[in-house]
Amino acid sequence: EHAKWQGQCQSCGEWNTLSQLSVAAGSSATTQRGGYSGQLAPLQTLGSVPTMDNERWRTESGELNRVLGGGLVPGSAILMGGAPGAGKSTLLLQVVSGLAERKRCLYITGEESLAQVALRAKRLKLPVDVVSVAAQTSLEAVFEYWDDYKPDVLVVDSIQVMHSEALETLPGSVSQVREVAARLVQR
């Protein structure tokens, strides 16, 4: 699946081998207008919007805190990117392990088994009894964990393998990644 028209397949280099796949209109939760109720929120001036100026959850990583402007802002969504093997999963596990000492944290792994995540945590000498983990690729199942556990911090590793049952496309496709990201941010 491609975000725009492609004449040549980027994987095999062949021309005119791609076929069009249409996603049914209205099947996406992101097609709703407004908020959850479908009602437009009233306009406000920036000065009237309440802010949590000083509330940030500092992580164990000084560099990550610096990049995030002082730490994690409650309610924010952060997308971490990088090349395979760059250490994204390791960094996320270190961060969530540090935060779990004082916040409820849930780590969802979609690419690795629970044994692999636990082995990495032990190798890094991270506290293994403070982070709740689940191996899952269904967004709807993740929402069930979220509703039951009510975490302060949710880590999804990785969004690329997550899928929503609301769409009939493959996990990792452009429409799936957009849908999953949009629904996670809305929540």
Labelled PLM ranges:
Residues 89:
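Walker A/P-loop
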Residues 3-78, 100-107:
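Detector for small/aliphatic-rich hydrophobic stretches
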Residues 75, 83-86, 94-95, 99-186:
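Conserved inter-motif catalytic segment of the P-loop NTP-binding fold
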